[in-house]
Every structure is written in structure tokens, then in C-alpha cells.
Amino acid sequence: MRSWTVLLGVLLLVPTSALMQEKGGEDEFGPYEVVSDWPQPIPGTEGYTWGSTGGVFAETPDRVWIVQRGMLPLPAGAKFGAPLQGSGTGGQGQKWQHCIFVVDRNGRMVQSWTQHDKIFAVKGARGPHKIKMNPYDPQKHVWIMDDNLHQLFKFTYEGKLVQTWGEQLVRGEDDRHFGRPTDIDWLPDGTFFVSDGYTNTRVVKFSPDGKYLTSWGTSSEGKANPGPNEMHTVHSVAVGRDRKVYVSDRTNSRIQIFDENGKFLDMWTNIRRPYHVLMSRDQFLWVSDGETHKMLKYDLTGKFMYGWGTFGPLPGRLNGVNQFSVDQENNLYVAEVFNGRAQKFRPRKGADPAKLTGQELRHGALWTP
């Protein structure tokens, strides 16, 4: 761990632009450069570092929401922020603090919902999985999934818990239960879809007021050549302007596309492990691949357009991007479950705009023509 700290210091002294001017070298971070020392240590957490970081959502450049699965004690000699392989999965010394917090553009914590840490401090739980806001909701409710609790939570913007779906630690496949839900996305009228999930193999559709409407999907476990609507690890969901529902069928290495009522339309294969899918405002589907550790861009016919990313624990490298988000200044944020951290990338000077991860929908900034 000490050698990592020394190496990181050396690397961070060398500007990316300087590396690009030399002969040889590599393009590790695509059109971005990593922002060092982001986020900053949380006051009062000396001796601890991030747990596994499940989700990140950029509301604005100065309000970036992060959810993590508790905090872990630092090994002797390590500094805050050091990545810990597989961190946050119930390790010895884990404490449930600052599971939901907000940082500004410099990585300083500006808000923490410590009143809700107790939600996740349950035996058998492992902490929040992803965090989002409904882009069509002017009240900007905050939605958080906890897969091991089998629950979905809806909070007011100020932090009041107003609605819960699912029963704590009870798995089910009916209209009142989940089987480790993973993600959520919305139609303009507030109708929403939940990817469900690690143990269930379905997408669940709810009305704007949260009533169960329908679900679709069957298990493909044990099948060598699974067909349409058969799934294994339904890990993410995104809805396009065309109202199509794009579903990460992770273990089957593909994206399946349905209409809003569950009719199968298409599938894109040979995407190794699609962890998270994001529909950009300009109508491209971006995917974080948890096996190749790359950020991938596809047009809506499924054509591969571009990809970048390098595996590893050093700043700028990736390991298990469970969720990513882009702010209004085109900064990219990633939440890594296996490196146990969130990272911020800013566009390089002169970066090709077509290679920058597209901005997602958010309130006040919807689809572009």
C-alpha cells in the first residue's frame, strides 16, 4: 500500500498533456483526465476509507450524490481513499456511516444523510446499490435501491423517506416483493421500470403513483443459448425518448430491448458484462462493462461506436463501475464497487465531443433534438 502511495504521487506530477506530446505512450483515459484527490476525506472519519461504492448521480457539478456500503478501517500506512479490493462487503471493522452523501466540484462533502445510515445497518444487508433522480420530477425526489434488502426507497429532496417498495430481507416475485432489485428509470408521466435483479430475472413496471402494473422476464439459468425475454442478472435499465426499455442482461452478456409493455424488440450480444446502462440526451446508449472495464458507446441500432478504459486500482483506472453519471460541464463520475471509490474525470482540452460520455436526463435538461 505504501508503494502505491509513492507511485500515485509520481504519476500525478506528470500532466496528461505532456504524456501525449512524447513519443510512444498510451491513451489510458480516453478523452478525459482524472481529477486527483476527489472526493476529499469526510470530516470525522480519520482511520477509515470508502466502502464499496455502489452509486453516483451528478445533479449539478456542485451537487454530486454518492452512495457507499459503509466505511472500512484503513490498513496500517495507507492514506484515505486507497482502493481496497472487494471493499465494503461486510469486512471486519466496517461501520455504517455516510452511506448517502453529497459533494461539491472540489470533492468536499456538503451534505450527508446520516439519519438514514440505520436503514442499511441490518444483518444480511450490504448497503445501497444505485442512486437516481426522476428527470421529469420537479420536486427532485431521490431514489435508492438496496439489492440485499430487496427494497426500493423514495426520499424527498430534503431527505424524508416517503415511500418504500419491497419487504426488508424478504425475496419474492409477486407484485409486492423484489429479488435483489438493481436499477430504475422513468417515462415522462412518471411511470417507472425496475430491473429485478440478481435473483429475480424480470423487469417490473409501476404506475406514476407506485402501483404494480406488470412484469416480464424468465430465468435463463443453465441454458447455453438463452432466447428473447430470458435473463440472468438483470442489472440495469434505461428508457429512451422512443419509450423503448433497454435492459442489461448481464450474465448473458447482452442488452435486451423491449417496448414499454414488455414486448421484445431486439437484443445486442457480445457485451461482456454490462453493469450499467445510461441513455444520453443525444440518444446513444452508454454501457460500463464490468469484465473489460471499459466505457462503451452504442447507437440505437446497437452499432458499437467507441470505448475506452483500463483495469486497475490506480487513479483513472476502473474496476467494477456499478453506476456512472455526467454533469452539465461534461465531467464524468464513476462509482466502483471493487475499487471501493468514486472517481471524477474532466474532459481533456480539445477532446472530441463525440467520445465524451453523453449527459443523462435531469430535471430542466431533457432530450436534445
Positions of the model-derived regions?
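Blade-loop segments of beta-propeller domains
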Residues: 71-139, 169-170, 312
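Blade-level signature of beta-propeller repeat domains, shared across WD40, Kelch, NHL, RCC1
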Residues: 319-369
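A short beta-strand motif characteristic of beta-propeller blades
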Residues: 38-46, 110-121, 163, 169-174, ...
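A short helix->beta-strand "capping" segment at the edge of beta-propeller domains
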Residues: 24-49
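Beta-rich, blade/repeat-based domains predominating
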Residues: 47-59, 95-98, 118-138, 170-191, ...
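A short loop-to-beta-strand structural motif that recurs across blades of beta-propeller domains
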Residues: 97-101, 151-153, 202-205, 254-256, ...
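Short loop/turn segments immediately following the C-termini of beta-strands
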Residues: 61, 69-71, 147, 157, ...
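Conserved beta-propeller blade signature
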Residues: 63-65, 141-143, 191-195, 244-246, ...
